[in-house]
Amino acid sequence: MSKAIIKFVRLSPTKARLIAREVQGMNAELALASLQFMPNRGAKFIANAISSAVANGGFEPEEVVVSSCRVDAGPVLKRFRPRARGTASKIRKPTSHVMVEVSKAQKKEA
């Protein structure tokens, strides 16, 4: 089993979790292929984490399974936008920590 962590990704964790749930339990090669054609911005970061986890273990993508894909909330960058009458409104720019673990696929006995 090997893992990869990408920290401080400028992406909302709620949006990234939608993609992380899709690839969990998938074959790594199939997960990378499906993430390549997803229109979401977070798919690129999760694909990078999966390929990094595969490389960290010294595996080939077709022989491993994404055992866990987790997206945790990172620190929130706070900005202000000037508004009418001298006031300001908050802008929250959330960040995420993407954690991916891959492990060898269990061989099914026939």
UniProtKB/Swiss-Prot annotation:
<dbReference type="GO" id="GO:0003735">
    <property type="term" value="F:structural constituent of ribosome"/>
</dbReference>
<dbReference type="GO" id="GO:0006412">
    <property type="term" value="P:translation"/>
</dbReference>
<comment type="subunit">
    <text>Part of the 50S ribosomal subunit.</text>
</comment>
<feature type="compositionally biased region" description="Basic residues">
    <location>
        <begin position="85"/>
        <end position="95"/>
    </location>
</feature>
<dbReference type="Pfam" id="PF00237">
    <property type="entry name" value="Ribosomal_L22"/>
</dbReference>
<comment type="similarity">
    <text>Belongs to the universal ribosomal protein uL22 family.</text>
</comment>
<feature type="region of interest" description="Disordered">
    <location>
        <begin position="85"/>
        <end position="110"/>
    </location>
</feature>
<dbReference type="InterPro" id="IPR001063">
    <property type="entry name" value="Ribosomal_uL22"/>
</dbReference>
<comment type="function">
    <text>The globular domain of the protein is located near the polypeptide exit tunnel on the outside of the subunit, while an extended beta-hairpin is found that lines the wall of the exit tunnel in the center of the 70S ribosome.</text>
</comment>
<keyword id="KW-0687">Ribonucleoprotein</keyword>
<dbReference type="GO" id="GO:0022625">
    <property type="term" value="C:cytosolic large ribosomal subunit"/>
</dbReference>
<comment type="function">
    <text>This protein binds specifically to 23S rRNA; its binding is stimulated by other ribosomal proteins, e.g. L4, L17, and L20. It is important during the early stages of 50S assembly. It makes multiple contacts with different domains of the 23S rRNA in the assembled 50S subunit and ribosome.</text>
</comment>
<keyword id="KW-0694">RNA-binding</keyword>
<dbReference type="InterPro" id="IPR036394">
    <property type="entry name" value="Ribosomal_uL22_sf"/>
</dbReference>
<dbReference type="GO" id="GO:0019843">
    <property type="term" value="F:rRNA binding"/>
</dbReference>
<dbReference type="InterPro" id="IPR047867">
    <property type="entry name" value="Ribosomal_uL22_bac/org-type"/>
</dbReference>
<keyword id="KW-0689">Ribosomal protein</keyword>
<dbReference type="InterPro" id="IPR005727">
    <property type="entry name" value="Ribosomal_uL22_bac/chlpt-type"/>
</dbReference>
<protein>
    <recommendedName>
        <fullName>Large ribosomal subunit protein uL22</fullName>
    </recommendedName>
</protein>
<keyword id="KW-0699">rRNA-binding</keyword>
